[in-house]
UniProtKB/Swiss-Prot annotation:
Membrane topology of this protein: Peripheral membrane protein
Protein name stated in the entry: Protein Syd
Matching InterPro entries: Syd (IPR009948), Syd_sf (IPR038228)
Function according to Swiss-Prot or TrEMBL: Interacts with the SecY protein in vivo. May bind preferentially to an uncomplexed state of SecY, thus functioning either as a chelating agent for excess SecY in the cell or as a regulatory factor that negatively controls the translocase function.
Localisation: Cell inner membrane
Classification via Pfam families: Syd
Keywords recorded for this protein, A-Z: Cell inner membrane, Cell membrane, Membrane
UniProt GO cellular component terms: cytoplasmic side of plasma membrane
Lineage summary: Bacteria, Pseudomonadati, Pseudomonadota, Gammaproteobacteria, Enterobacterales
Coarse class of the protein's main subcellular location: membrane
Length: 181
């Protein structure tokens, strides 16, 4: 496990939960995750869940992605997807507002790996260098990803070679990410 990435993700999650406490006097709340089972759910009110992060309970790797495409995934990405179960979290980095994607449950972890495989298959078909997404943006055409060759965090336009480097490392990106509600 890449401890720098795991620690940076836990630290961002703590900052995110603290902003919820300061501004809304509650745990993080999600309507999108209402009715979806997870060890993160603390309470349900109306059609929303209140959640807190929980330790990841499965093998700490995304080896299914590696096996499917016969590649080696950068260690920080293994750590990112297997440090915790949590709801998606909003943040801002270099003026970009984004939604940091998280794994909600054991079942969700399977879906996340399938989506990563699909993303990599499309890139391979288009002869693009491999990236694994970690966040979404307002524009559905753009995502925040980690380049599997360099380890850099990039803003990429899906289906194209257009990439803008945001950070030299995933841990550095997470350490500079500002939580927003």
């Amino acid at each position: 496990m890449d401890h720098q990435t795991a620690e940076a993700l836990r630290a961002f999650t703590q900052r995110y939960c603290a902003v919820w406490q300061q501004q809304r006097h509650s745990l993080p709340r999600s309507e999108e995750l209402y009715g979806v089972p997870s060890p993160c759910v603390v309470d349900t009110q109306g059609e929303a869940v209140f959640w807190q992060p929980q330790p990841f309970s499965l093998a700490q790797n995304i080896s299914a992605v590696e096996r499917a495409l016969d590649i080696v995934v950068q260690q920080p990405l293994h750590s990112y997807y297997t440090t915790q179960f949590a709801g998606d979290m909003s943040g801002r980095f270099a003026g970009e507002t984004l939604t940091l994607l998280q794994t909600w449950s054991e079942e969700d972890f399977q879906r996340v790996q399938e989506n990563l495989i699909g993303h990599l298959v499309v890139q391979k078909r288009l002869k693009l260098s491999p990236t694994l997404f970690i966040a979404t943006l307002e524009s559905e055409l753009d995502v925040i990803s980690v380049c599997n060759l360099s380890g850099e965090v990039v803003k990429e336009t899906l289906g194209t070679a257009k990439r803008i480097t945001l950070s030299p490392s995933l841990a550095g990106f997470l350490n500079h990410l500002e939580p927003v509600l």
